[in-house]
Amino acid sequence: MELLLIRHALPLRIDEGAVDGPADPALSEVGHLQARALSDWLAAEHVDALWCSPMRRARETVAPVAERLQLEVRLEDGLAEFDREALSYIPIEELKAAGDPRWNEVPEQPEHFRRVVVEAVEGIVAAHAGHRVAVVCHGGVINAYAAHVLGIDDPLFFLPTYTSISRIFAASTGERSIASLNEAAHLRDL
């Protein structure tokens, strides 16, 4: 089976104190354009199923894909980002550009986060043998699963682009192989 792990589109910034409770931002205008470009790109692929993080930025990213492909979206709590309880959301690219050290923060209890992600993704793999499945999630989730496949400890070893696709093949023997990381050809014209 083939997994397409897709990072959500660009969300809005939410500063601490701007909302009651955890920050769960909607997509920005650019994010909606990215999500539409992704849906156009995936229309040329044969996708059999759609899975998604329950977080708003992921759900809004997958919505045009589901509409275009006429597929139902399944939510999986184990695909939520490690910052799901944060009181603010600042896009990591903004943090990095500003020299803010938070851009490279790893999740609290990275081993636990990785276990949750791997269990969720492997559950999707088990449910879809022989199929191509698109999974809209988060940069931390993609890093955690890719690091698991590669056998590395670094919980955040690369920065997936918004709506980028990382392809992983999952054999019925349990073997996993990464075909690509961070495909973003669908964003060329944005």
Predicted regions and their residues:
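Generic beta-sheet signal
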Residues: L3, H131-G139
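Active-site-proximal alpha-helix that buttresses catalytic centers in soluble enzyme cores
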Residues: L3-L69, V73
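Short active-site segment of divalent metal-dependent hydrolases/proteases
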Residues: P11, V141-I142
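Short beta-strand scaffold positions
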Residues: C52-S53, R115, V136-C137
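Active-site signature of alpha/beta-hydrolase-fold catalytic machinery across serine-
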Residues: P64, A144-H148
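Acidic, low-complexity terminal tails and accessory targeting/binding regions
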Residues: L71-L75, E81-E93, A126-H131, A147-L190
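Short glycine/proline- and acidic residue-enriched helix-loop micro-motifs
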Residues: E94-H112
